[in-house]
């Protein structure tokens, strides 16, 4: 599994390689991740190498090769080509009705309904706490809400602890969708949905967690993930 910082560093290295063909220096990595020392970068690099995401080439300065990326960057999720859109920026509360985003369109106020477990299921949350502003072209049709992600079971799908998950309200899902699943009317969790014969599989995107296989009468879909709102 990847921590938030490991994921951010891997993405930064990959983007720099795509742009220039040259890996970033340790100082550049340190600044990009807002770390105080290069020792933290050394630890992150070692962790990524041990997990098989990168490879350091011997006897060459700044020689790092990206071997693989988490699922969204590969576009290889259960629903082919599906990658949640990510808004990076300030997770402030919704602005007033006269506010507009950079494109000139009025943002949509999406209610935040609490927290959702990307790990061990937590109790279902029904309380609306506040709203966040989201670009309208990210939402599409239908009713939407947001949930703050807690846990790391979906990290290899690019969903990190602390992200705000943007959910399209729906009672149905296709195989490969990442959904908000209500289990036994008590526990809510964010997982990838698949049908396995007469059963439903709720799959994590982290090998440290197990797939849950449940009968349909124990699972109720409450929405599908359409995007992420991430604060840096």
Swiss-Prot record:
The record marks 118-119 as: Cleavage. The active site is at residues 153, 191. Its EC number is 3.4.21.88. SUPFAM superfamilies: LexA/Signal peptidase (SSF51306), Winged helix' DNA-binding domain (SSF46785). Disulfide bonds: none annotated. One of its GO terms (biological process) is DNA repair. Gene3D superfamilies: Umud Fragment, subunit A, Winged helix-like DNA-binding domain superfamily/Winged helix DNA-binding domain. GO terms for molecular function: DNA binding; serine-type endopeptidase activity. Residues 26-46 bind DNA. Keywords: Autocatalytic cleavage, DNA damage, DNA repair, DNA replication, DNA-binding, Hydrolase, Repressor, SOS response, Transcription, Transcription regulation. InterPro entries: LexA, LexA-like, LexA/Signal_pep-like_sf, LexA_DNA-bd_dom, LexA_repressor, Peptidase_S24_LexA, Peptidase_S24_S26A/B/C, WH-like_DNA-bd_sf. It catalyses: Hydrolysis of Ala-|-Gly bond in repressor LexA. Represses a number of genes involved in the response to DNA damage (SOS response), including recA and lexA. In the presence of single-stranded DNA, RecA interacts with LexA causing an autocatalytic cleavage which disrupts the DNA-binding part of LexA, leading to derepression of the SOS regulon and eventually DNA repair. Belongs to the peptidase S24 family. Homodimer. NCBIfam families: lexA (TIGR00498). This is LexA repressor.
